[in-house]
Regions:
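Conserved alpha/beta-domain cores
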Residues: 249-543
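Generic secondary-structure signature for well-ordered alpha-helical cores
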Residues: 48, 52-66, 78-85, 91-98, ...
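Acidic, glycine-rich flexible loop/linker segments
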Residues: 2-28, 142, 149-154, 158-285
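Conserved, well-structured core domains of diverse proteins
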Residues: 1-145
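Residues within well-formed alpha-helices
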Residues: 49, 133, 188-192, 282, ...
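Short, charged N-terminal helix-start/capping segments
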Residues: 80-128, 194-218, 294, 302-321, ...
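N-terminal-biased segments
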Residues: 113-151, 219-242, 440-471
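Conserved active-site and cofactor/substrate-binding residues in soluble primary-metabolism enzymes
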Residues: 38-41, 45, 71, 84, ...
């Protein structure tokens, strides 16, 4: 029996035959080209063909796994048309007199290395997207065939890495689990696994070191372990655990469509946190009442240049339409600190967590801010969009935001562009905002308490420093007292207050939050039903 550790992308237990997927590596040779113009045209033709193929993949994914998962292929089309990517390929052809295949391969290496080196895990996941579109181009240019994954029976798919174009073409009935050596929890494969509700592991080092194709495997998505050729004792133990898990899952699934209300009638809203359009499928599949946090900064982080108003509008409009009237709270740009974006040209800071970030960037770079607000106000005409501003610490910041909002609305009205009337709220994630929350509550429609940063700033602990893990205590009495104060101040002003940080998903505090009168919890989609069960089993009057 072999045992390998990985990082869980989704929980669950899978038992079955292993299917190893190893795609044929494309050998790209460097060739001297005399006619660079013809070679550049050959590349442009390949881009057109790739865009056409991606359109077909989008249609297939749309039918099989929904619009949110299909959106990855629209993103790939945008990446193919990206000016920086295209310019890099064309310049290499021109400057080095080389074939288009080689120029694409070089560009792929450069761009994927850039993404892979980023601190943010979501952005590291974009390295695979770059490689995927590049391999598609090289296949078209060289006249090759795309790899496909085929299996005669439901199997555990194990691979070095899996690209979106590979997973979408699989027969979903034949997939028990995904296990990859590389990848990230934000990769398309991980998101697809969460949508399908099957266990998945990424970063599973060494799993392909042995010849394992056709052997029996066990994937434990809860503990991040895969067993190859398990002994009878391990197999029997996991069969029992799998049966127990299936029973628990069925019980939780029965809670879909049920109200988030306690035994004594206390109501609370359960919303979901997401970072991209693809995750909307998870929001809907887990029966969330809305989106409590859409992290719009990822629209910026996955690019090499500023997204246009139209690009942002289309994304926010998709969110609004997919949620079909349910609230979708979109947080404005939250770049800075641990989320850096090179093309913003921000100065290097000694302490970025206390530096120019989030709303501070927006209020000093109003051109960027107004572009995003224009897109949000336009999209609000298509659904129930709320706008949320991060990192607030001062009353004057709210006043300035209101001025900019009014400027944007006036500009759109002058252009006769349709807009909605979105609710606007703020994140309470600085002690300053918590302490003046009684005054802030008079100027906004809702509060969302960001417990990650609130804990960091309250306890003076850098949450990015692993040496301080012992000191980072989100259960600290000071943090909980601050949350209670914010909730009370919100209610006095007649607005609602929710929690969107890690604490929201902490089941040991669910009853405490109910007792405090918290109106909304926003958590990862997979935590919705387990927390709903706790809520429905609780009598607040007895706490």
């Amino acid at each position: 029996m072999y045992e390998y550790k990985g990082k869980s992308a989704f929980g669950g237990i899978a038992i079955g035959r292993i299917k190893v997927y190893s795609k044929e590596q494309q050998q790209v040779k460097r060739m001297h080209i005399d006619d660079c113009e013809s070679e550049k045209q050959r590349y442009i033709n390949a881009v057109d063909k790739a865009v056409e193929q991606l359109g077909m993949l989008y249609d297939k994914a749309l039918k099989e796994v929904g619009e949110a998962n299909a959106a990855i292929f629209e993103m790939h089309q945008i990446m193919l048309e990206d000016d920086d990517y295209k310019e890099s390929v064309l310049n290499i052809i021109d400057n080095q007199n080389v074939n288009a295949e080689y120029a694409v391969a070089q560009t792929s290496d450069n761009f994927s290395s850039m993404f892979a080196a980023m601190d943010d895990e979501y952005m590291r996941g974009r390295a695979l997207d770059v490689r995927d579109i590049s391999e598609r181009l090289i296949t078209i240019l060289s006249g090759g065939k795309s790899s496909t994954i085929e299996s005669d029976e439901p199997s555990i798919i194990i691979a070095e890495d899996l690209a979106p174009s590979e997973t979408v073409q699989m027969d979903k009935e034949k997939i028990l689990s995904f296990v990859s050596v590389k990848g990230s929890v934000n990769s398309h494969t991980a998101i697809l696994a969460r949508t399908m509700g099957i266990p998945a592991l990424i970063g599973t080092k060494g799993v392909l070191d042995e010849d394992i194709d056709g052997l029996t495997g066990i994937v434990d998505g809860f503990n991040g372990v895969v067993y190859i050729n398990p002994d009878s004792e391990t197999l029997d133990r996991y069969k029992k655990e799998q049966a127990k898990y299936i029973e628990q899952k069925e019980l939780l699934n029965r809670l879909k469509g049920k109200e988030d209300v306690t035994l004594d009638g206390t109501k609370i809203k359960l919303y979901a946190n997401i970072g991209n359009v693809k995750d909307i499928a998870l929001v809907l599949a887990n029966d969330a009442a809305g989106i409590g946090l859409f992290r719009s900064e990822f629209i910026y982080l996955e690019r090499t240049d500023f997204p246009t108003e139209e690009e942002q509008f289309n994304i926010y409009k998709t969110v609004a339409e997919n949620m079909a009237g349910k609230p979708a709270i979109i947080r404005t740009l939250d770049i800075g600190a641990d989320k850096q974006c090179d093309y913003f040209n921000l100065d290097k800071e000694d302490n970025p967590a206390l530096g120019v970030r989030a709303i501070r960037i927006c209020l000093t770079r109003t051109d960027i801010f107004k572009t995003q607000l224009r897109a949000l106000y336009r999209a609000s005409a298509y659904g129930n969009i709320h706008i949320m501003y991060p990192m607030i610490a001062n009353m004057w910041e709210i006043d300035r935001i209101k001025e900019i909002e009014n400027e944007v609305k006036a500009e759109l009205a002058a252009q006769e562009i349709k807009i909605g009337s979105p609710k606007t709220g703020i994140m309470i994630e600085t002690p300053a905002a918590a302490m003046i929350s009684d005054e802030l509550a008079k100027k906004v429609d809702f509060f969302s308490i960001g417990t990650n940063d609130l804990t960091q700033y309250t306890l003076a602990v850098d949450r990015q420093n692993p040496k301080l893990d012992t000191f980072f205590d989100a259960h600290h009495p000071a943090v909980l007292k601050m949350i209670k104060m914010v909730v009370d101040n919100a209610h006095k002003a007649g607005i609602w207050a929710g929690i969107c940080g890690e604490l929201g998903a902490d089941t040991s505090l669910t009853q405490k939050f109910l007792e405090m009168g918290v109106d909304e919890l926003s958590v990862s989609p997979g935590r919705i039903l387990p927390i709903r069960k706790i809520i429905r089993d609780t009598d607040v009057s007895e706490l």
